[in-house]
Amino acid sequence: MEIIKTAIEGVVIIEPRLFKDDRGYFFESFSQREFTEKVRKVDFVQDNESKSSYGVLRGLHFQKPPYAQSKLVRVIKGSVLDVAVDIRKGSPTFGEHVSVELTEENHRQFFIPRGFAHGFVVLTEEVIFQYKCDNFYAPQCEGALAWDDPALKIDWKVPADKIILSGKDQHHERLEEAGWLFDYLSLIHISEPT
């Protein structure tokens, strides 16, 4: 597995070693040992999968403590633009984001540590999206930001009139209005490799 650092410390792209032959391909999608050595120690406790069509945008979501989550995400079928936004007060990259295209062809994975809002938009006719979380889903701790907050300057690569949102995702606050954010100093130690 190759680790590609991004402009925001702790947010990484993971490129697996792919073995191809005339039968197809094989790759190791996750190794606890290698992830701990190259990224950081994490104990994933829940795997989720979603199916969506072109233009569906899910996000920008996060969970507040004590159920804050790190996520390791990837695409099984299709293509998405995946986005992580730094919402850690006091962070040198507060309000900045990293975006990466995840596809069934590139097999890339995207690691989003705690302290980030996460979302993705579907770029192909259909997508099957999978993600690992290091904490359980807790609806009472849900938080979210507006996907179209101009301060975030996210180019979603899909025209705004083609974006499909859930009812809930249509009414989130902008970052400057957010009533709750993560504290950078309390999270910095868990974003470092062991």
Which residues fall in each region the model found?
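Conserved small/polar residues in nucleotide/adenosyl-binding loops
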Residues: 188-194
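Short beta-strand His + acidic residue motifs that chelate non-heme Fe in jelly-roll/DSBH
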Residues: 110, 118-123
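Non-catalytic, conserved peripheral segments adjacent to functional cores
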Residues: 1-108, 124-126, 133-188
